[in-house]
Amino acid sequence: MARYTGPSCRLCRRENTELFLKGERCYTDKCAIKRRNYPPGQHGQGRSKTSDYGVQLREKQKVRRIYGILENQFRGYFERADRLKGVTGENLLFLLERRLDNIVYRLGFASSRIEARQLVRHGHFTLNGKKVTIPSIQVKTGDTVELREKSRKVASINESLEAVVRRGIPQWLELDKGAFKGSVKTLPVREDITMPIQEQLIVELYSK
């Protein structure tokens, strides 16, 4: 499945929730879903009731788009989550939260996960002192993510760090803003993920 390259705001309207795909714009009145809270398209305001399967599919698509994951990769995360001990749906969210690009976003180095992924791929960060360029790396407790010295004057990164107060930093992470680095204090728990996600719907979809 190809990566979506169309307008990001249409995805938020399609899923009827804020996916925070456009950085700071999503926190302003310019956010499309605040202005037009209905699906895109000619018949967006008059669509009929969705089936159970449709509801499950939309939830899966929503989570996929929040984290910017392609279908095959997302299914791979689900299969891995299903093999782990614990609740499959929660395991899935934990695996997605522990992606390096998500950590970069959560710490405030980027205004969106899309931007965070680009920054990682372009080699702006180190993980435990080593340069990394793979956004999907899974972090673990005690890991340290640091912005490389040569990247500390990048305007967009500094602007994101200044604005991080708006969305806050999860309790399981710690940011040393002055040193341009953050660390993983502990692994996330379900209460740390405050986005409106019903992961059980995804489990039901993939279990058919």
Swiss-Prot record:
Keywords carried by this UniProt record: Ribonucleoprotein, Ribosomal protein, RNA-binding, rRNA-binding
Query: GO terms for biological process?
Result: ribosomal small subunit biogenesis; translation
| Residues covered by the S4 RNA-binding domain | 98-158
Please give one Gene Ontology molecular function term for this protein.
rRNA binding
Q: Which GO terms describe its cellular component?
A: small ribosomal subunit
Segments spanning the bilayer are none
This protein's source sits in the domain of life called Bacteria
Report if keyword rRNA-binding is assigned: yes
**Any Pfam family matching the protein:** Ribosomal_S4
Question: Family per UniProt?
Answer: Belongs to the universal ribosomal protein uS4 family.
Its quaternary organisation is: Part of the 30S ribosomal subunit. Contacts protein S5. The interaction surface between S4 and S5 is involved in control of translational fidelity.
Physiological role: One of the primary rRNA binding proteins, it binds directly to 16S rRNA where it nucleates assembly of the body of the 30S subunit. With S5 and S12 plays an important role in translational accuracy.
The protein here is known as Small ribosomal subunit protein uS4
Source species: Geotalea daltonii (strain DSM 22248 / JCM 15807 / FRC-32)
Instruction: Give the source lineage, highest ranks first.
Output: Bacteria, Pseudomonadati, Thermodesulfobacteriota, Desulfuromonadia, Geobacterales
